[in-house]
Amino acid sequence: MDCMITKLNEKDQFISKIKDSDSKIGQFYHFDAMQEKSYSERLSMSNNGREVALAQVIKNYMSDLTLTEKQLQNISLLSEGAKVIIGGQQAGLFGGPLYTFHKIFSIITMSEKLSKDYNTNVIPVFWIAGEDHDFDEVNHTYAYNAQNAKLQKIKYHTMTPPEASVSTYYPDKAQLKDALKLFFKEMNETTHSKQMIEMCTKIIDQYDSWTDMFKALLNEVFKAYGLLLIDANNTELRKLEQPFIQKIIEHHQDVDASFRNNQQNTIANGLEQMIQTDTNVHLFLHEDNMRQLLTFKDNQFYLSKSDKYMTKEELLKILEVEPERFSNNVVTRPIMEEWLFNTVAFIGGPSEIKYWTELSEVFNTLDVSMPIVLPRLRISYLYPRTEKLLSQYQLKQHSIIEQGIEKDKEKFIRAQASQTFVDKVEEIKVQQEKLYQSLLTEVAGNNDNQLLVEKNNHIHQKQYEYLINRYLLNIERKNEISMKHFKELSETLHPMGGLQERIWNPLQIMNDFGIDVFSPSTYPPLSYTFDHIIVKP
């Protein structure tokens, strides 16, 4: 395998501004990601004293997995105070989109770099967002059917989606296996398919909850790197979080005020508003089998789905006895994560690193230091077949990754068409426009006749446009094979109008190039970069 770096002209310049240490953005982070002193300062910061308990929670959480020596060593190092690089993601079906794996590679790459540069131990940690309850975001994935050059949506169907967190959801194993069968049916059958299906089936059989299956898959792929995993909704973890949840409850008005003020400042500085929330408590409570957002009104805490009010004392009593019933929202989750871990840097997707700018004051209010914030690596896979087509049509990969294929496709069709034919029709259109302008002069003052002429002109102009479009469509149909090639390029490099990593599933890459394609022995060594990486399997 090989990899190369390419620069894309991005519409959104946010990541470029971080790279350039833009002060308008930098004022909302606690550290400049581009300054070496930021890393040395984070690495030398005092630990929070929770590392022994946290390491034990992670060890217990991962006890149902087959761990490598490196993972066991990292758990031990974590308990001794080793700093971490951290990032997280929702538990997507069959691993979710490729960018989940790329986020993990970003965490691993940065932890290895800092360990080497500073001659210390920096541990890679992946945070599974198991407390989320929006099942529609994780219940599907896509498989690329090379024969039809088409992406097929694969969905796990259920009549009873979880009302609470996905980590407490136990999917129907037979239906999950049906989805797996459909997933592999869409893809090419390769020498790796049987082994892949066996691995996934074994995970479905061995584990019960949605996030445990996700955890097991990630561990299979990344255990050799020493990656540690934790579910944000883990019961033992929630017990450890208990005092900080209490602090959020007791200071919820200050937390909300600092968040709202911070958000207004980011907007005033020209940044896009990222977090939309009506709550003023920024915590969820599990009540009546539902994960419900707490709101403070009429001097009490209110649950809208259950239409219940609670006093602060009642809420704190629940926290004392059943802390696992509480969970964080988008505002408090990052702060909780950093309260737990001794973090050097948080690595997030483009939207995540944006919404962290809205939390700077919340970190201060809760006396937690915001770590360095970095964007994850962005990676596309260039298949040999794709490379061959690019060469055949003399196209640039970075152009398609960035803008899609439509302009190149239109250029190809026009090249096969008679430009004389198109020009003559365009000429007729211009001549007719002039003719109708003279007709309008003849009927000036008669509103009905003016409307009649304008309408008739419009009909004729439409007919000429139809003639050109239909002519080009016939050219397109005549070049059916080339059109399929263009579709292939689109679905592989710019699927559904965006980056490959946002749509494609990592199991597709494993099915095509081997179950160990993401392992240290096969995957090319990565260097952290703000630019786009192209991997050639």
UniProtKB/Swiss-Prot annotation:
InterPro entries: Bacillithiol_biosynth_BshC (IPR011199), CC_BshC (IPR055399), Rossmann-like_BshC (IPR055398). Keywords: Ligase. GO terms for molecular function: ligase activity. Belongs to the BshC family. HAMAP family: BshC. Involved in bacillithiol (BSH) biosynthesis. May catalyze the last step of the pathway, the addition of cysteine to glucosamine malate (GlcN-Mal) to generate BSH. This is Putative cysteine ligase BshC. The lineage of its organism: Bacteria, Bacillati, Bacillota, Bacilli, Bacillales. The gene is bshC.
